[in-house]
């Protein structure tokens, strides 16, 4: 199963983003397809934080618009929204021991641990920091 990182969601929403068209097509294709795909809950909240932040975008996305974007995604029958499960503490420990992720990278470790716990093996992201987490194949859909 493929999972999406926050940046794909942000690029799909923000038309001025360099990768907007590609991200929008990717997201629309996954949402309308039958193959299971996933987003970890921390990415949902990070999307809201980024697109509605005045310090990031001028003007920022209106909160109601951002929420409606998410509600439309949530209607996709093939989407799996992933959170911490029963094995999360042990998976978190393994991910942190292996990656030595700390500081700002702890957030990425949280996402990686959720995905690994749920058996996700491929993450689509433009964030190269995820390459440090063994057990996740990282694909940048914007690189040729």
What is the predicted role of each segment?
Residues 1-39, 54-68:
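Short, well-structured N-terminal submotif of metal-dependent ribonuclease cores
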Residues 33-34, 76-77, 133:
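Structured helix-beta-strand junction loops
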Residues 36, 78-80, 137:
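Conserved beta-strand segments of alpha/beta enzyme cores
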Residues 60, 78-122:
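Active-site neighborhoods of divalent-metal-dependent phosphate/nucleic-acid chemistry enzymes
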Residues 38-42, 125:
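Short beta-strand segments at enzyme active-site cores
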Residues 8, 43, 87-88, 110-111, ...:
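Alpha-helix capping/helix-boundary segments
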Residues 1, 112-144:
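Acidic, PIN/NYN-like endoribonuclease modules and their adjacent C-terminal/linker elements
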């Amino acid at each position: 199963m493929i999972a999406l990182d926050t940046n794909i969601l942000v690029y799909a929403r923000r038309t001025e983003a360099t990768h907007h068209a590609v991200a929008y097509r990717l997201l629309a294709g996954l949402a309308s397809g039958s193959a299971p795909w996933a987003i970890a809950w921390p990415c949902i909240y990070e999307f809201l934080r980024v697109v509605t932040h005045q310090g990031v975008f001028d003007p920022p996305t209106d909160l109601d618009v951002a929420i409606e974007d998410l509600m439309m995604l949530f209607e996709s029958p093939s989407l799996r929204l992933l959170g911490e499960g029963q094995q999360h503490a042990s998976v978190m420990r393994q991910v942190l021991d292996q990656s030595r992720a700390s500081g700002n990278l702890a957030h990425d470790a949280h996402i990686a641990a959720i995905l690994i716990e749920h058996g996700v093996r491929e993450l689509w992201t433009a964030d190269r920091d995820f390459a440090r987490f063994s057990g996740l194949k990282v694909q940048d859909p914007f690189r040729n």
